[in-house]
């Protein structure tokens, strides 16, 4: 009750550049260099700026810019190697669509090669349509702890949608395939859940933050 309503308009944001390194844009009196990939992250950033301005009187714009430019967010179109292999925890239709749109914008000449797993409570009907429309190759797997849909159940869902796919027994096996794709032709995308983060990072020699979940 009596809360202040702030409306963020796309017309208030001036996009300066958008590439595989991040996004630069102008908003209000700010010129922002955001190191996160994806135009959807611009709205997240602008929302954070507005919240900070409400909470902090006379906020220092230089400090805001410095904080943003040092931002990192694991599992959000995160580049895992110098080749084009990414990890994204997108696990619903909107998140997966944003991921696909971002990667296609950055790599318009390449096909998508995916390693996918997901929880059983998601809307697989719409997600399956996205996968069929967007991916040239898709591999499915399950996490070690069995939190996610079994490969057998996920395979049946994709079969009903006439989606060609390869089933593998583990994240490790799927990652090994992704690592060996033709990077001149494909972009590798590992996506669908944060539950596989530790397994994915282990395969790429990256440290796993135990606060991640």
Functional labels for PLM-detected ranges:
Residues 47, 181-196:
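Short SAM/SAH-binding signature in class I
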Residues 3-7, 111-112, 137-140, 208-213:
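Short hydrophobic/aromatic-enriched beta-strand-loop microsegments
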Residues 28-137:
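Nucleotide phosphate-binding/pyrophosphate-handling subdomain across enzymes
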Residues 1-2, 20-22, 84-85, 128-187:
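C-terminal helical cap/extension that packs against the catalytic core
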Residues 194-213:
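Glycine/aspartate-rich loop-and-adjacent alpha/beta segment that forms the canonical ThDP
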Residues 1-30:
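Extended acidic/charged loop-beta regions that coordinate divalent cations
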Residues 96-97, 124-126, 150-151, 199-202:
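Short glycine-/acidic-enriched loop or helix-start segments at secondary-structure transitions
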Residues 10-12, 116-119, 141-147:
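Short, acidic/turn-prone active-site loops that include or flank metal/cofactor-
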